[in-house]
């Protein structure tokens, strides 16, 4: 599967990117795209809720149907090993919510995208490797 891995937050100015992520998922899930969303409270304390509250928010506000994991840290001593690998491959620490990482079918890092890069702006990169 092609993976788009994203650190997310419910109370961020970039939270509306959930819509773009869901649109990408709807469009490409049958071609092998999986979106893996990891809530994180490390940036501006913008993900204060419990895992259940986060899931309810995503379901009711954005109708999210892609994988939403439990809240984690993405930087620092308690960072998830997955995000340690991703930031090593990308060559930089995560600066804010909604940082995205594209992984090909072989499990290889393709590239990272900063917070400001909207999901629809990375569609061409997904199409090229799916």
What are the language-model segments listed below?
Residues 6, 69-70, 113-114:
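Residue-level detector of conserved, well-ordered beta-strand and adjacent loop positions
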Residues 7-11:
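Amphipathic alpha-helical repeat scaffolds
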Residues 1-3:
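Proline/glycine-enriched tight loop/beta-turn segments at coil->beta junctions
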Residues 81-84, 88-130:
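Thiol-/selenol-based redox modules, centered on thioredoxin-like
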């Amino acid at each position: 599967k092609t993976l788009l891995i994203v650190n997310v937050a419910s109370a961020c100015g970039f939270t509306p990117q959930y819509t773009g992520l869901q649109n990408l998922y709807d469009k490409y899930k049958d071609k092998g795209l999986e979106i893996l969303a990891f809530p994180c409270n490390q940036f501006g304390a913008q993900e204060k809720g419990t895992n259940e509250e986060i899931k309810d928010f995503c379901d009711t506000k954005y109708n999210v149907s892609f994988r939403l994991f439990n809240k984690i840290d993405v930087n620092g001593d308690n960072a998830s090993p997955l995000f340690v690998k991703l930031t090593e491959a990308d060559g930089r620490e995560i600066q804010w919510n909604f940082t995205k990482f594209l992984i090909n079918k072989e499990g290889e890092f393709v590239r990272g995208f900063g917070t400001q890069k909207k999901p629809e702006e990375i569609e061409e990169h997904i199409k090229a490797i799916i």
